[in-house]
Amino acid sequence: MEEYAREPCPWRIVDDCGGAFTMGVIGGGVFQAIKGFRNAPVGIRHRLRGSANAVRIRAPQIGGSFAVWGGLFSTIDCGLVRLRGKEDPWNSITSGALTGAVLAARSGPLAMVGSAMMGGILLALIEGVGILLTRYTAQQFRNAPPFLEDPSQLPPKDGTPAPGYPSYQQYH
């Protein structure tokens, strides 16, 4: 599957780090706002303050974690593109598995295997959905079969009028 709007590999890492950080801050901000609101003392003022405080403290941390994941994933993906010489879904699946394993390395080999499997499965699902969507949308833009005219509506070839029309040859 070709990706048309992707940057070349050195800049792709920076681009993916920034995108992942942004996703983490926004998603984490929404989640932390709800969590801070629910865990604050009773009263709308306390709840809004608790919500804002939770977002201020936790959203940048979550964004940083997402940025680390995105940067490591893109680095491994670019390395695989360079190593294999082609860009295909297997690079992303392998990158997801290796990223999961590397990030879980401090937790031991069992956690590494579990995280590698989860990363690979997650990326396989994402790539599979992307391929299915590409195939589905490609079918929508196929050329339509040529429109064939109804032969009963075409004028006759031998000069006689079509049925229901008078013959004007008698007036010549």
UniProtKB/Swiss-Prot annotation:
Stated membrane topology is: Multi-pass membrane protein
Q: Which family does it belong to?
A: Belongs to the Tim17/Tim22/Tim23 family.
Pfam families the record matches:
Tim17 (PF02466)
Q: Which superkingdom does the taxonomy of this entry point to?
A: Eukaryota
GO BP annotation list: intracellular protein transport; protein import into mitochondrial matrix; protein targeting to mitochondrion
> What name does this protein carry?
Mitochondrial import inner membrane translocase subunit Tim17-B
Q: What does this protein do?
A: Essential component of the TIM23 complex, a complex that mediates the translocation of transit peptide-containing proteins across the mitochondrial inner membrane.
Q: Which InterPro entries match?
A: Tim17
Report the PTM annotation. Answer: Forms one disulfide bond.
Q: Which NCBIfam families match?
A: 3a0801so1tim17
